[in-house]
Each structure stands twice: as structure tokens, then as C-alpha cells.
């Protein structure tokens, strides 16, 4: 609690699970069931804030949420009719439940940060990555109802906790992953969404990193894609979140911005 470099607790990485294994499915409702991620997050936050009341509390989403007319007792899918009863999302990316049952931190509500994760078709060919997808089509089919509404309705601050992926021709020959990365990057710039990029190291098998060749080479192309989404002034100087200390040798402090 005395370490002032720790500003937030991300309570759990990527809660997930589907109804085909109910005991392992993270859900989001107003119950006190042991697999209710909302309730678990509120309990965990209470414990953390009792020790350090100054921290931000980051809460990720879940994987699935029941479609209209169904509840958490529905099976994952009716294979005879090919009917799906849940809205799917990336692990940690589904905040549909927060619309009716938002996280309640009591007197610490202003310290809540919702944190979705988002990835491209090289991680998994989700339905919204159909041929000809655009930023607008992903927004309509996935982003808005799963997490973007939280920003638009000013429910709580939003941090894109993970986004990233391959952009080289070997891994992304048709350019679809690069297209998704660009769509999300531009959305975050347009809406001033905070984010943390996944990842620096090269040994993340389905995304790669900002370095390669046994950590010896900086990926200039990938950095060039990410760089416009990093906070900088009109002269390209990166801006620190600290009012006193600049970020890096060529950056500026928040007070100097």
C-alpha cells in the first residue's frame, strides 16, 4: 500500500467460460452466486480498498451474456436448430451485464475503470470479421453493445486493457489483422480511449510483440501503427501523466503540456 508506482488493481485477467460447462462459466447478474463475476469483483475491490483506499479498480468483462428472452440457465446452443442463446465476446470483453447491473464500489465509485480486451482475426475468426468488415460494421455488430456504450453513456472511465497483433506479411498475408488494428486504433484516437498495448515481448504466440529476433530487433512497422494512439503534443513530444516528471528523455510532464 506504500508503493506509489501502483495506481490500479486489475482484479482478474479475462474472466470467461460458456454455458456448456456451467460450473466454469463467469456470469454477470445481481446474484451472490460464486460464479457471478460482478459480485466477485465487488467483494475483491472491497478487500483491496480496505488496505489502500486510493487505488483505481479495474474490472474486466466476461465472455458470454444471454440473448433477449433467455437467462443463465439456457444451454450454450441448440445443435438441432443451430440456435445460439448467448452473445459471445473476447475473454474479458463482454460488458452487456453492466448496463442493468453496473459494478457498485460505494463511496469509491469514482475509482472504477472498466477494462475490455479486444483482438483481431488472427487470434480467432469472430463473426464480425466477415469479408469487407469496417470500423462501422464492427461497432454495430460487436463493440457498441459489448463495451463502447459504457464510454458513450459516461458510465465509468474505460481502459482498453489489451489490444495488439501481427501485421507482417508472413502472419497476416491478407491484411485483415492489420485492418482491425487500424480500425481500433483510430476509434481510440477519435474517442480518446486510454489503452495498454499487448505486447512488448515477442513470445506471445498469437500476437507477437514490439520486439523480435530474440528480443534484439525493434518492430518499426508495428510501432508506427501504434504510435499515433500514444498521447503526444503537436510537436510529437510524449506527455507524462505525472505533473512533475517528464516521460523519457524527450517527453514533457503533464504540467508542461
Where are the language model's segments positioned?
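Extracellular glycoside hydrolase catalytic/binding regions
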Residues: 3-7, 12-191
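Aromatic-rich peripheral "rim/lid" segments of glycoside hydrolase catalytic domains that contact
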Residues: 169-257
